[in-house]
């Protein structure tokens, strides 16, 4: 009754978390609480457990419980009952209770129950650890690693237990690359020197055959514990360096560390492998109470070393010590008995296996079969084989080897045929399920293996298996293989055609998808809604209005035009092709208004007419159709202009009023995009701060991109740093965004750090990311880094890559390199574009290659048919003017018949200033001021011309005009990285802490310039350099 009182809802004493947690250890406690009469496997254990619990002797209770068979099965039954009871009583399953329930199901290996409970939780690191531990224990390493990545994506900070679980998985799978990434994360979190995490790292590197790395990690651990030492010398053992392992063990003992049980067992095993059986026995004798693992090592080790009699002796000594044998113990001693062919001892061990309930174990059964076979007792072996209901390939092989050993070849073939025919009952439904699993996990290798078995079993012509194979290969990225399977299929149904057409649409190969769709109809296969939807999606991708209309006609013919799914796809196709009128017609023809079809039409209106979209939204509310998150996200995205910010804010209010959360990634990014695109940066930042953590990578990237697009580059970089501090791993879109920010800020140090992170995260560099890196390095002045990224690109078929490198060389003064890259580009048959020629002409201008510049300009127009833009002409004017061809530059401007543009006169004005052509310069400056009266550079250059002529009155008058017009000189800025610190300089600003040293250095430079006649001494003395 006491326990029943604890379960009443009114009782304040009920600690649901502690209770559920204990179920993993004491299911009998739960059985007594609920009063269920659940028969125990061993009534004595049950009674002992009840007595210990009644006396609150929990330690003894646990010891008794650990000896009870089938305790996990009992724990699961009781756990489900307690979980059900907590739901009935209305107990909140969040927090510690929820974690405890997940932990219970995880420890009982109930994957589906654990995942369902986990999905309902507000997850913390404890829940994640339970799931990771479960996936690890049931042998699903892929799940472990993917869940670990999801943990980071959900911005949950892992703890030492998390790292330990994932590192152990990496160790088992020898996935050293993923392990290194985890190592980097641990370094960032400052956990690599922790003995717990350090030990896991040592173990991972050791098991991945990176013993040198394991040793380096070990030496970094502040205070290595016994586990760390054990992992290290275990690593040396695995690496085939047993002598070094023994040295580590001896050093461990010399430094005062008491080896734990695992250490003893590992070193004993090492001694045995080295053939030092005497040392192994001496060390084994030092163990106060060796457990079954230690005994197994001695039995197995001596048996493998040819000391079968000693191994058998250790087995019987173990029995005298009251240590219970395991299947490994029995397997090892049976192997030794088989070698000595001592049937009497074999019978004793067989009796022991029956007594322990292990005779039905497949491993023990295989050992028994092997032992009897070697004792030439195949009848006894056959009895063991037949007695076992569940057989695996090991068991079958043991019998085959037994008959072979005894020369019964006909029995071998008979058993082999039985094994193939009835041993494994795998049919087409089984293979379909297996292939579906491969498709979902994108496991092409496993799928290919199943395909081989299917071929051998002649199931490849089965329609269901064929469809599953096409789907598996397509989803695993092997579309050509999927097509081959498709072409070889004798029978095809709608599922077959839908699968292959949808695969090509997904691969963005719309032309092939259209061809297959036509072929399908020619074969007389009636299209269904799924097939039409896939084909219409292809039409949408290429804006194929003609093909879309054909599909529309076919849908009418098939009677599917009024189908909701097909109708929505038609609306989407017409909208994205810009035919909103036809989209509205399709919408009106549908039998009822649904949120799906309305969303499609609202999306169409949003792209073409925001006002119509708002009207349709209001009509939607009037008709009683409740908008969804997609509805709001679609219409909010359309409010991307400053004038529509008010409307967007009103929709934001509607979202909140209707109970929709901005936490959702799709809706959240839509709102943030709306605010930032309409320059509502304050509102965007406020919304972002309100979103709960962990925030997704999409939201972080959106904030960076929005700030960058609005010119807030430093703020964008701050968001990136905050994101990294929160433990969120960037993706390719994030890298591209933040690298562009580094380009604008000329932040080479940050750019290099991001490049390094891309490398360490093992991201494949696509063309976009590579081009952005090339541009970043170039704009930061590091052409070596830019060239290296370019050289490492797998494919350089995109003109953007070449343009980035050419312009980088040109702007950094490496004209010869720019021209060489231009020649290489043409030799690689890459067609140059306008940007290419602009970069090459810039290079010619900086290097004074007037003749080459003229030829390239003519090549652009004559050979490649590219019309000269103002930028190209301005570049040519700069080239001619910079090197003294002022008259030709002036004539060149007049010959182009272009609309007057400030860039042309600005280039000519700069050239006149350099070569002292004051008359032409004055004319150019006046034309420039006429075109751009607010451009301060024109006034400054003209003022310098007046100053050089000594016309101070004109210069002062010009400055007065600047003041009257409100024209202010825009200060120039520069960023310089020195010793990992970015220094920002602005023209006219003397607030830098080292300004004194800077001015002294500038004076020295001025003196050198005067001595070399680089500048006119009179100009320097008059201080007119300050105006430039």
From Swiss-Prot:
* Transit peptide feature, positions: 1-30
- The source's domain of life comes to Eukaryota
Gene Ontology cellular component list: mitochondrion
| Stretches forming PPR repeats | 94-123, 124-158, 159-193, 194-224, 225-259, 260-290, 291-325, 326-360, 361-391, 392-426, 427-461, 462-492, 493-527, 528-562, 563-593, 594-627, 628-662, 664-694, 696-730, 731-765, 766-796, 798-832, 833-863, 869-899
Cellular localization per UniProt: Mitochondrion
Q: Which GO terms describe its molecular function?
A: RNA binding
Which intervals of the chain are annotated as region Type E motif?
904-979
Q: Name one GO biological process term.
A: RNA modification
Annotated Pfam families: E_motif (PF20431), PPR (PF01535), PPR_2 (PF13041)
Record keywords, A-Z: Mitochondrion, Repeat, Transit peptide
- Positions of the UniProt region annotated as Type E(+) motif: 980-1010
Q: Which residues form a coiled coil?
A: none
The answer, when asked if Mitochondrion is one of the entry's keywords, is yes
Provide the family line.
Belongs to the PPR family. PCMP-E subfamily.
Q: What is this protein called?
A: Pentatricopeptide repeat-containing protein At3g09040, mitochondrial
Source organism per entry reads Arabidopsis thaliana (Mouse-ear cress)
Gene symbol here is PCMP-E88
């Amino acid at each position: 009754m006491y326990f029943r009182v604890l379960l009443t809802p009114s009782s304040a004493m009920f600690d649901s978390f502690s209770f559920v947690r204990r179920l993993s250890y004491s299911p009998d406690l739960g059985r007594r609480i609920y009063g269920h009469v659940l028969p125990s496997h061993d009534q004595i254990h049950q009674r002992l457990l009840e007595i210990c619990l009644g006396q609150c002797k929990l330690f003894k209770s646990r010891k008794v419980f650990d000896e009870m068979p089938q305790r996990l099965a009992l724990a699961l039954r009781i756990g489900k009952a307690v979980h059900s009871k907590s739901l009935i009583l209305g107990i909140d399953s969040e927090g510690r209770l929820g974690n405890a329930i997940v932990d219970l199901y995880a420890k009982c290996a109930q994957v589906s129950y654990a995942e369902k409970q986990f999905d309902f939780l507000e997850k913390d690191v404890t829940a994640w650890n339970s799931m990771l531990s479960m996936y690890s224990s049931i042998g699903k390493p892929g799940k472990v690693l993917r869940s670990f990545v999801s943990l980071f994506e959900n911005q949950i900070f892992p703890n030492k237990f998390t790292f330990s679980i994932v590192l152990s998985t990496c160790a088992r799978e020898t996935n050293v690359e993923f392990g290194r990434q985890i190592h980097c994360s641990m370094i960032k979190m400052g956990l690599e020197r922790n003995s717990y995490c350090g030990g896991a790292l040592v173990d991972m590197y050791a098991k991945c055959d990176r013993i040198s790395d394991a040793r380096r990690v070990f030496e970094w651990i502040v205070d290595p514990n016994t586990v760390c030492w054990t992992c290290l010398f275990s690593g040396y053992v695995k690496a085939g360096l047993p002598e070094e392992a023994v040295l580590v063990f001896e050093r461990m003992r010399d430094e005062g560390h008491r080896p734990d049980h695992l250490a003893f067992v590992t070193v004993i095993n090492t001694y045995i492998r080295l053939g030092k059986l005497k040392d192994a026995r001496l060390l084994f004798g030092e163990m106060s109470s060796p457990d079954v693992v230690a005994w197994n090592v001695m039995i197995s080790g001596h048996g493998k070393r040819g000391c079968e009699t000693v191994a058998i002796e250790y087995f019987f000594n173990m029995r005298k010590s009251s240590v219970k044998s395991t299947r490994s113990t029995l397997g090892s001693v049976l192997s030794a008995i088989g070698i000595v062919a001592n049937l009497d001892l074999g019978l004793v061990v067989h009796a022991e296996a029956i007594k322990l309930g292990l005779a039905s174990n497949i491993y023990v059964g295989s050992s028994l079969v092997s032992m009897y076979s070697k004792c030439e007792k195949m009848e006894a072996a056959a009895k063991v084989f037949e007695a076992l209901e569940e057989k695996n390939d090991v068991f079958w092989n043991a019998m085959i080897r037994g008959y072979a050993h005894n020369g019964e070849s006909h029995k071998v073939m008979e058993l082999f045929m039985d094994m193939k025919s009835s041993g494994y009952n795998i049919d087409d439904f089984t293979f379909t399920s297996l292939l579906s699993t491969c498709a979902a996990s994108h496991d092409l290798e496993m799928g290919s293996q199943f395909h081989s078995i299917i071929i051998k079993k002649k199931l490849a012509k089965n329609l269901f298996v064929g469809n599953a194979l096409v789907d598996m290969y397509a989803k695993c990225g092997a579309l050509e293989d999927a097509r081959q399977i498709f072409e070889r299929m004798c029978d095809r149904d709608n599922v077959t055609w839908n699968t292959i057409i949808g695969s090509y649409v997904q691969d963005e190969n719309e032309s092939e998808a259209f061809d297959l769709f036509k072929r399908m109809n020619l074969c007389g296969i009636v299209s269904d809604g799924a097939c039409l939807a896939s084909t219409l999606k292809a039409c949408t991708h290429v804006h194929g209005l003609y093909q879309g209309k054909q599909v529309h006609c076919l849908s009418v013919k098939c009677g599917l035009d009024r189908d909701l799914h097909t109708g929505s796809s038609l609306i989407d196709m017409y909208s994205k092709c810009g035919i909103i009128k036809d989209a509205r017609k399709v919408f009106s023809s549908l039998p009822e208004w649904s949120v799906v079809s309305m969303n499609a039409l609202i999306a169409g209106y949003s792209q073409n007419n925001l006002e119509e979209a708002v009207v349709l939204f209001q009509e939607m509310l009037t008709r009683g159709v409740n908008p969804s998150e997609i509805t709001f996200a679609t219409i909010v995205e359309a409010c991307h202009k400053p004038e529509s910010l008010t409307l967007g804010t009103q929709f934001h209010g509607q979202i909140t009023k209707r109970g929709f959360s901005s936490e959702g990634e799709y809706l959240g990014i839509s709102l943030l995009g709306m605010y930032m695109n309409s320059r509502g940066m304050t509102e965007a930042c406020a919304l972002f701060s309100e979103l709960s953590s962990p925030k997704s990578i999409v939201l972080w990237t959106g904030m960076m991109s929005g700030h960058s697009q609005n010119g807030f580059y430093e703020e964008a970089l701050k968001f990136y740093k905050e994101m990294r501090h929160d433990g969120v791993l960037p993706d390719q879109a994030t890298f591209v965004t933040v690298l562009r920010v580094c380009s604008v800020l000329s932040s080479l140090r940050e750019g290099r750090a991001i490049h390094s992170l891309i490398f360490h995260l093992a991201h494949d560099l696509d063309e976009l990311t590579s081009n952005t890196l090339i541009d970043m390095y170039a704009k930061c002045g590091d052409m070596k880094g830019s060239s290296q990224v370019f050289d490492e690109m797998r494919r350089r078929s995109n003109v953007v890559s070449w343009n980035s490198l050419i312009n980088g060389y040109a702007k950094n003064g490496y004209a010869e390199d720019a021209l060489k890259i231009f020649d290489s580009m043409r030799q690689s048959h890459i067609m140059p574009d306008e940007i290419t020629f602009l970069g090459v002409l810039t290079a010619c201008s900086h290097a004074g290659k007037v003749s080459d510049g003229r030829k390239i300009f003519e090549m652009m127009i004559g050979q490649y048919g590219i019309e000269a833009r103002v930028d190209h002409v301005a570049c040519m004017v700069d080239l001619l003017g910079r090197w003294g061809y002022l008259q030709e530059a002036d004539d060149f401007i007049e010959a182009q018949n272009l609309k007057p543009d400030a860039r042309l006169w600005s280039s000519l004005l700069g050239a006149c200033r350099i070569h002292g052509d004051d008359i032409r310069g004055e004319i150019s400056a006046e034309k420039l001021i006429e075109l751009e009266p607010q451009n301060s550079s024109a006034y400054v250059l003209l003022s310098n011309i007046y100053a050089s002529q000594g016309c101070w009155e004109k210069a002062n008058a010009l400055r007065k005009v600047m003041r009257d017009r409100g024209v202010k000189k825009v200060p120039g800025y520069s960023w310089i990285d020195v010793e990992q610190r970015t220094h920002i300089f602005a023209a006219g600003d003397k607030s830098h802490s080292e300004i004194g040293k800077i001015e002294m250095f500038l004076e020295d430079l001025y003196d050198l310039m005067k001595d070399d006649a680089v500048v006119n001494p009179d100009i320097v003395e008059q201080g007119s350099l300050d105006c430039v």
